[in-house]
Amino acid sequence: MKHRANGIDLFRIFAATMVVAIHTFPFQSIAPFLDEVITLTVFRVAVPFFFMITGYFLLGRLSLNFSYNNNQRVKKYLYKIGMIYLYSILLYFPLSLLNGTISLKMNILLLLKVFIFDGTFYHLWYFPASIIGTILVTLLLRSIGFKLTVAFSTCLYLVGLGGDSWYGITNQVPLLNKLYTFIFSWSDYTRSGVFFTPVFLCLGIFAYRVSKKLTASKILNLLFYVFIIGMTFESIFLHRFTNVKHDSMYLLLPSCALILFLMLLNWQPKLKVKESADLTLLVYILHPLVIVIVHSISKYIPILKNSLLNFLLVVVCSFILAQLLLNLKRKLRVSKQKIPFERASKEISASAIHHNINEIRKIIPKNTNIMGVVKANAYGCGMVEVAYELEKIGISFFCVATIEEAIALRKSGNQGDILILGYTHPNRINDIKKYNLIQSIVSEEHGKVLNLKKIPIRCHLQVDTGMHRLGVTPNVTIIQQMYLFSNLKIEGIYSHLGSSDSLEQESIARTNTQIFLFNNILSDLEQMGISYGYTHIQSSYGILNYPELSFDFVRIGILCYGFLSDYNSPTKIPIDLQPIVKVKASLITERIVEAGEYVGYGLGAKVEKRTRIGVVSIGYADGIPRALSNAKLTLEFKGQSIKQIGNICMDMMLVDLSEVEDISLNDELIVLPNISKIADEEQTITNELLSRLGSRLGTELN
């Protein structure tokens, strides 16, 4: 899919230049009429264009899904614009005092009027207008939906239009005259966040909604010319025959702005401007300051009083100043490159994740989707990093064990569905709703209590088909009752296979019984006319040993991370896996220990000869089993094996460097080079060994 922002980004430069023109009147010395028809008419599309950008990139997604992340994006935007407005107020405070926009003698109501509607300097109205408009449209979208929001915003624009370019006409109507007298007691202009901004935010939202269907069209070009010519004649008529209060709003301006924006979405210029959003924002903020400076200089250099030359100089200087500030920002900014973890870390391979998912997709039916199981910090590998990589390759459904994990994943920016597999106390129901999570109903009582909270939440129904851990009784009457609860939006039903990891006859019999029972429940629900939603019963071993099953989802955990749980248990379907994680730690010091000396805690390790000992910055608090102490663990460095000696400490371990070449302090060693082998030797499964990896380990995604 082509990138829709290229044309938008480049036009930001033109739009910023138009704004400068509006404030400098470039044709005044040559042909003032051109300022009327070009600067104060055609160039008026510039500010609506910027508001439409906000509607498109910020509110478009929100209009379709009021998710936690989309709401957070709006809150962050409002905070950002608020801070920019505050800094801009401080920057222009001396000039605001000089031109009388603000005064220390003003009363509170007048100051509020200036700060909330007019702006403390003539161009700063944009920021409070953006804040007010965004808040207003967000509230309207949430309460009345997109179509009515567009209708309401259009009505507001028409009211504003009557107090702007059409004021000379509306002012003749007594009732309207009283209305605008009241409005102007609160704001100098109707060009504000109440009357002006909302309609253009809505047009940006509309453009977002139709962008995927949008194709290049000559009709768009024709419509733009028709509307821009029509708006020009509208402007000429109003300026010639009426008393225009202001000329920011025209009847045909929304149509011109919308058609222009749709054309720009189709425009894919080869020229790309880096950081165009930041660059044009700085130009917008700084250009009045440049205007003041150029005006002051023009007193001594008369040629600069030529309006066109004045305009060009202001434009060039504004862009140069903005670019210099961006360059300074880059130098002052802390490097985005990750600081190497000096102690210990996990290196996660994105390519290995992609490989494993591709191998899994070869096994499962084409109509079956993958749920990424990222509970227990993605089996110790890093929940946020793994989920981020899975999202990139099309996985949009995730499973966690607890609500705390679910909230952390959502706060990381994850946009997918998040299913909580475990029990969540009903008192946390507000959090389930707030973060748009999907809660498993793990028992009849759990479902009843959640429903009594009278807060609608998304759910999956977990059925106990024979594992006897969590799940409602496999009684179709009880299950039917759950589906009828008014506050539980049950979107799926699932179970968990207790013995799918084994091909022994008793395990196969148990698994087949569970599958049979689950299918019968689905069949009975279907006969009852209940739409039971998504279905899933297989986890990693369920797809390897029962590949013939076909449900809506499979829950993939250990296979995603490149391991089998137990390499001694054969599977019906082989799979080529690549481990995604390497555990690394630094060599932080070394010393020579004489023969006969003990090393580490206790008397378990006594060197028989003069030995070079190193200290590696990782221990059992980081998930390295203490049971591996004293030569049971082998580390690696550049293909060389390094034996661990002595008892593994909480934060460190000792290694024998006697036979190791070319190793220096702060070099990184691979601590668990063969996780599956270690799990086998410790008589456990790789799931346990991985999930032990501690939170102190940093995570590097490569």
Curated annotation (Swiss-Prot):
The keyword Transmembrane applies. The chain crosses the membrane at residues 13-33, 40-60, 78-98, 121-141, 143-163, 192-212, 219-239, 249-269, 277-297, 308-328. GO terms for cellular component: cytosol; plasma membrane. It is found in: Cell membrane. Pfam families: Acyl_transf_3, Ala_racemase_C, Ala_racemase_N. Its cofactor is pyridoxal 5'-phosphate. SMART domains: Ala_racemase_C (SM01005). Its main location: membrane. It is a multi-pass membrane protein. One of its GO terms (biological process) is response to antibiotic. The modification N6-(pyridoxal phosphate)lysine is found at K375. The active site is at K375 (proton acceptor), Y601 (proton acceptor). Gene3D superfamilies: Alanine racemase (3.20.20.10), Lyase, Ornithine Decarboxylase, Chain A, domain 1 (2.40.37.10). PANTHER family: ALANINE RACEMASE, ALANINE RACEMASE, CATABOLIC-RELATED. This is Amino-acid racemase. It comes from Enterococcus faecalis. The gene is vanTE.
